[in-house]
């Protein structure tokens, strides 16, 4: 599921228990390794919006013995977009059972990807960062907070993948099969506002790119987006709020991450989901910061996330692993026939300018014509 060779020429949680990818709010909670290990919901029980989880303590035996030549525990600050919070509840607990992680505590901050990146640039402590969008990692590189070669590993810096999917009511009563169904009269669509939600940008680029994959021109793909937004009944500020609204009864279909739909089903939400034949590969970047006071421990944690054990945890909770050979008995992860990547749309710089520039962006114009805010 790596980028295709061809480059095109013209170029989502219930309000009770789920945590989704692009919220603009924060709340606080405290988690411990025992709570995290027993239930991912324990770390995600704060709200359906983004959250900041306070210190996750190291095992008592490690605290009592000091450890790893450091003379005692160290605390890593993990700053991430909010979707993987349930996964990190398990990942941190598992890492703390390894020799490298036995003396490591964590302070965790989860929120909208762009907001999290801006917070780190503004001074929020961070040892390890994971974002929804590559552009957010680029902000930190430009600020000298992440090294220019952060993506030099075999996975090119992407710790997990997903795909843009269509979440439907149980039984799919509207018969949603692909993107063309979203612009039919009477179909009510939910997707977040792309000027506050990173997941919304994946959704929009997935919708546009699918039209190009089907052989349509740029003008025709643009017309599709205009028709799509006429059917969008709510544009929440975050992916989590959009999923919460959908689970609460709003709309017929929600455009969202595949992993969000999988996690919603795992938590008992009455939804189904469809992966279109032509859809966009979502890639989530991870890095150690240059400002970390604990580079050895931070790198050890990142290495664990890329390891067989770490990737297995990601896979079992709904993310597509980036380490070759990792599979899940829980989730099958079918490969869509027309899977494409952001590289096929010219890369993030070109796509951001074309679609989301605050003055000249295509989506900016569509949103303004519909009376939707294009600023946070």
Regions from the PLM with identified roles:
Residues 18-21:
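C-terminal motif of bacterial Sec signal peptides marking the signal peptidase cleavage site
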Residues 2-3, 26, 37, 68-70, ...:
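Extracellular/periplasmic juxtamembrane helices and adjacent flexible linkers that interface
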Residues 213-278, 285:
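Ligand-binding pocket segment of bilobal, Venus flytrap-like solute-binding proteins
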Residues 1-11:
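Bacterial N-terminal signal peptides that target proteins for export
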Residues 26-29, 33-39, 50, 60-196, ...:
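N-terminal segment of the mature folded domain
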Residues 171-177, 196, 209-217, 291-298:
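Short helix-loop capping/hinge motifs at secondary-structure junctions, enriched
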Residues 158-163, 225-228, 236-237, 266-295, ...:
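Periplasmic-binding protein-like
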Residues 93-100, 180-240:
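Ligand-binding cleft/hinge of the Venus flytrap
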